[in-house]
Amino acid sequence: MALAHTLGFPRIGRDRELKKAQEAFWKGELDEAGLRAVGRQLRAAHWQVQKDAGIQLLPVGDFAWYDQVLTHSLTFGVIPERFRAHGEAGPTLHTLFGMARGVSDDSCCGGAHAQEMTKWFDTNYHYLVPEFSADQQFQLSWEQLFEEVDEARALGHQVKPVLIGPLTYLWLGKGKGAEFDRLDLLDRLLPLYGQILRRLAGQGVEWVQIDEPILVLDLPQAWKNAFERAYNLLQSEPLKKLVATYFGGLEDNLGLAANLPVDGLHIDLVRAPEQYPSILDRLPAYKVVSLGLVNGRNVWRCDLEKALEVVRHARERLGERLWVAPSCSLLHSPVDLEREDGLDAELKSWLAFAVQKCREVAVLARAATEPEAAEVLAALEESRAVQASRASSPRIHKPAVQARLAAIKASDAQRRSPFAERIARQRAGLDLPAFPTTTIGSFPQTSSIRLARQSFKQGKLSEAEYIEAMHSEIRHAVQIQEQLGLDVLVHGEAERNDMVEYFAEQLDGYVFTRFGWVQSYGSRCVKPAVIYGDLSRPRAMTVEWIRYAQSLTDKVMKGMLTGPVTMLMWSFPREDVSREVQARQLALAIRDEVVDLEAAGIRIVQIDEAAFREGLPLRRNAWPHYLEWATEAFRLCASGVRDETQIHTHMCYSEFNDVIESIAAMDADVITIETSRSDMELLEAFEQFDYPNEIGPGVYDIHSPRVPSREEIVALLRKAARRIPAERLWVNPDCGLKTRAWPETEAALVNMVAAARELRGDLARG
């Protein structure tokens, strides 16, 4: 049979045991021995569950105390000086967690800010960015991989250690201090890979998996050349090497990847099925080919019959050189569907989490040589039934939604008048001062708010009691905003647990799991909603809350919604229709809410698109299509209102230059953005492009409890006014205030309002 393996398995545990142990350790409630014991138990359980599912070659090194890239940084001794404790022989778990979370001023190292965290390719997982210096030295400093190999082998498992490849590791990092080329570090780093491979060989390992996902990116020629050089140098080291690529197709890097002097290549045939024939044609006859046929980053069952066609063909071509795997590490999948005892039976039958995906991989591998095995035939029959159910289910396919999609006209995604005409009407109707002040939407989520929501869900509060509790919070938020002198108010979002989940719970076509947790970073786990069918809004979602808030004040109240692209990006999407179609369905549902808010007397509606840039494909040549449908989806949800109704959007990225034209194409009347940490430098993109609409650059960082002074905010606003005409500037924080406490929130907003008034004085004096 073909060999069944996985590239990695979720590390958090079926019941998020790792999260609970991490947080107990950080609070001092669990000692290091206790934390390490939890890690051992989880690793043993995860290896065994994969083995029981039919996986023959088990990954080791996919477990991490916080993040796999951070683990590699410790392994290679890439530890910034601020985290080095004087007198310690080497890094400890305290070092690791300090790099991830920062170190307080009273620790042994003194205060040290955490390393930067960013998205792992185009997933919703985040990694800790390695910090390199021009004189960076590498040395083996962390024994975790070798200890875990011994651990797994002692349990009788056949193992495949997992390493992030040298080129990908350098690509993921950033240079600190004097400018230098990270590739200059390669010759210093490669000897460590040699040491690691030799030590693993000494432990009895036969195969090692070397992850090089940057091979699916647009690589500069220097990096392509470096691949050949690096793997030529590693060729002489012991062990068979499987280079793993995922999250996309190799495209122009296909020849490079196929000809690397290694023993096998893993390719993602979920994201890029079209690369399969070319790989088989280009790969040397001695190499193993690992086919990623089961989606490692979604929750749907594999169409086994369709996948088996590829397996049969590959078996004929490759014989014993065929391996079968998920498309990528199962880190991005929830752990075990069996925990979901509350899910509707039909819906549950369509799903597969990590454990179930392992079984699918094993069935496909066995089917390569034993197509008539009872287990294979039963699995194929079950898969056919699932695919037939999904193809015909009226729960998925809704004629009314499809008819509405088909009826969309180009004019539906355009405001009635150009911005210049709209803004004149809006200014006349809203009658706001120069430098109008507002917030991004949410106010502090106190323990009393969370308790009220929890009690309502558990049936301990009646609906009337819950509504009154939320009304009380809204009254409090409105009263404080009026006292502070803000110009455009918000209701505070007390009723919302999450900016996606709140809306998804009220839309047809979404379902929620109880245990579908995936790791976002460290101990933070998220439970994305699942889009299973055509999406529609059965009733208004926010109107009553906003209408109540508006009834409390004569000032302008802003409605708050989450945009279609963000809803899509932070959910598990369908696989049977495109992301573009799902975004349009969401846009129509949100459009109805925007229109209803306008009818309720709400004159400003904010539609947040926090994930707009996150949706960009990994390859630049795919950007135009994505940006076209993503901007159209925003305009579709925002364009059903009169010119007098002002549409805001909020984005929180650190880079706008390469998408500024698309942001302008969204045609929001006002965009609020995160700029305080860049000292307003991000506004350069809007200045150079001559962005035509109004802008609210964030004037203070909400991620810090620190209260900015009036003088600081004034300085930032004056800097902004040198780039953007004063009449087009709004004044607001960087982001929502959900995670802050009320005292610091009020203190910061007092200074923000005072700063805006000072700028108005400047303007009046000319």
From Swiss-Prot:
It comes from the Bacteria. One of its GO terms (molecular function) is zinc ion binding. L-methionine binds at residues 440-442, 493, 608. It catalyses: 5-methyltetrahydropteroyltri-L-glutamate + L-homocysteine = tetrahydropteroyltri-L-glutamate + L-methionine. CDD domains: CIMS_C_terminal_like, CIMS_N_terminal_like. Its cofactor is Zn(2+). Zn(2+) binds at residues 650, 652, 674, 735. The active site is at residue 703. L-homocysteine binds at residues 440-442, 493, 608. Pfam families: Meth_synt_1 (PF08267), Meth_synt_2 (PF01717). 5-methyltetrahydropteroyltri-L-glutamate binds at residues 16-19, 119, 524-525, 570, 614. Signal peptide: none annotated. Its EC number is 2.1.1.14. Keywords: Amino-acid biosynthesis, Metal-binding, Methionine biosynthesis, Methyltransferase, Repeat, Transferase, Zinc. InterPro entries: Cbl-indep_Met_Synth_N, Cobalamin-indep_Met_synthase, Met_Synth_C/arc, UROD/MetE-like_sf. Binds 1 zinc ion per subunit. Belongs to the vitamin-B12 independent methionine synthase family. Catalyzes the transfer of a methyl group from 5-methyltetrahydrofolate to homocysteine resulting in methionine formation. This is 5-methyltetrahydropteroyltriglutamate--homocysteine methyltransferase. It comes from Pseudomonas aeruginosa (strain LESB58). The lineage of its organism: Bacteria, Pseudomonadati, Pseudomonadota, Gammaproteobacteria, Pseudomonadales.
